[in-house]
Structures are given as structure tokens and as C-alpha cells.
Amino acid sequence: GYPEFAVPAEIAKGIAAVGFDACSTASNHSFDRGLPGVRATLDALDAAHVKHSGTARTKEEADTPVIVSHGLKLGLVSGAYGLNGSTPPKGKSWAWSDIEADHLIKRAEAAKKAGADIVIVAAHSGLEYHHEPTEEQIRLAQRLTASPAVDMVYCHHSHVVEPWTRMNGKIVMYGLGNLVAQQSSNMPGTDEGVVGRVTFTVRSGKVSTTKAEYIPILIGSKNDGPIRIHAVDTELKSGMGNQARLKSAQQDISRTVTSLGVDGVTEA
């Protein structure tokens, strides 16, 4: 069978404390603890003032666009490829969002109608431990970016970094790797990840991508002690940490992110 995961509710406070104001909750593990687990997760995020997209406690919540305001309004739409063989309870399919393209586009359109200036789609998709996007990811990205309602797409699930590209003038990140994880050292690349930083320009309702930057990160000790996230470039410049490993991570990540030869994607 598949592994099942749960974490203490306090992690939501940590998510907020480091600066996240919204997140995707749609994944293949969304229902590892059933509908009570979905409710508990969203309750904890609400208590920490972190907005969320991808799972819901009610149909009304599922149908309400998720929008974060920071001057401009950013809409978040998310979905996942499956639930490891499980399904939401009968009559409650709204409790979890899949990545069927028409469904995601409809939600993106609803976010724009609700006032979002920019809409980002988060797709839990790909093949675990593979650095190349799957045909399904590519087809989904093509469909999504063809919609005027979608301004960017990013993916997660593979646990390793995947390439970035542009489709229909819009940034697509096929895989961001891991952010906080402690996977087996037999899985190369699972201690590497990227933080994306994208700058948008909105003029007369039209959205364009001004910058698309990636920040390489390396996850700390796999054996003992607390897990830490290391900003690769910062520690290389300061001489801190394992310089050889930091350098190889920087090279691995940069080679993968830019492997499709897309102009305008640079290391921050």
C-alpha cells in the first residue's frame, strides 16, 4: 500500500511564521486521514491565517475563489492527479480538487471574475524522483496556459527539481523539488529544491512576466539533528557549510531548471 502521513497542527503556525500566506492542500495524500483530516488541516491553517486551495470542508468553500491581496490580488487554484486509490466520501467530491484541465480553468476564471489580477495554478503532478516532466504534465500545462485566466503554473510531487519553461508566454515550473523533507539518501536529489520568485506586470488588465528567478536550496542533515534549509548561494559566498556539496547542488539545480533553454529564467 501507500504510506500515510500526518503532522502536528502546530506546523501551520510555523508555515505562517516564515512568511507563507497561502498554500495548496491538494495532493495524493490529502485524504490520508479522511475527511476529518481535511477538516483538521484547514482548521489549523485558518487559525494561523494561511489561506488554502485544493481541499474543502463544504461545497460553498470549494466554490469560493482563494485570493490573497498585497496591493495586487493573486488567485490560487490547485489540484492533484489522484488520491492513492482512495476517494472523497460519496456525494462530497467537492472536498478535493483534481487536475482535470477544464475544472482548473473554470476555477481560474472564477478567481479572475472575483477580482484576482493574477491567477496561479498549482498542479500536484509528475513522476516521483524523475527530473523530466511527463507527457501528462506537458499536456496539462499547454491547456492551462492557453487560457487567458491562467498566468502561471507550478507543479509539485516528484520530490526532485524539474525544468522551467514558457508556454504561451507564461512561466511553467514542472517541479520545485523538496522544501522540508527527510527522505532516504538512496534517492539522489531529494535534498535539493528551488524557491521560485516571479515578478509580474499588470497593465490594463493584461498580465506579463517581468522576471522568473530561482533560488537553489539544500536541505540539511539527513541523519541527526534538526532539518534545516540552506540558501545555497548565500552559504557559498559566506564559506559556510559543506562547500563541495553546496556547489554540486547549485550546479545540479541550475542545469535542471534551465535544461529546456528558456530565455529569461535566471538564478536569483
Language model: regions and residue ranges:
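Acidic, metal/ion-coordinating pockets
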Residues: G1-A268
